[in-house]
Design a protein with these regions (language model features):
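N-terminal acidic leader/helix
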Residues: 82-89
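A short macromolecule-binding patch
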Residues: 67-78
């Protein structure tokens, strides 16, 4: 799946809130009206490496210039909806996991879904091995598209 960035500010996410919020309130995306997604470039295309189902929203797992992050889907438009079903996996979080209930489920490459600590290693701890696996899988996916 490929997406194009339309927005990179928390203020833009206000359109998708369930109720009106003042600018300094944290909304369902974990962002205020002042939040900036500096890792995103408006108009740029991104290859989606996974979908993260947070408690109150969904996010794409993407990278920009080597910086891996999860960003709310509402910041993008889908430009290629094809998903590699042969190599993508799905996992529902167990309530005993540290990331539950904040993350409910993950859809993505094998290691992301089958290692219970993969999300933490990749996004929170930024472990080198987890990042290497991410980019290895990205290269494989780019060859298929």
């Amino acid at each position: 799946m490929k997406v194009r960035c339309l927005y990179n500010r928390g203020e833009d996410l206000r359109l998708f809130e369930y109720k009106p919020l003042i600018k300094d309130m944290i909304g369902r995306f974990g962002a205020t009206g002042y939040t900036e997604y500096n890792e995103l470039e408006i108009g740029k295309e991104y290859l989606v490496m996974g979908l993260i189902f947070f408690e109150t929203y969904q996010a794409y797992l993407i990278d920009d210039n080597g910086l891996i992050s999860t960003c709310p889907c509402q910041l993008f438009e889908i430009i290629d909806s094809r998903v590699n079903t042969a190599n993508w996996h799905f996992r529902i979080m167990d309530k005993t996991e540290n990331i539950y209930p904040f993350i409910q489920a993950i859809l993505g490459y094998y290691e992301l879904c089958n290692d219970k600590k993969a999300y933490e290693k990749l996004i929170i701890e930024k472990e080198e091995e987890a990042c290497q696996i991410y980019f290895k899988r990205k290269i494989e996916l780019e060859k298929e598209l």
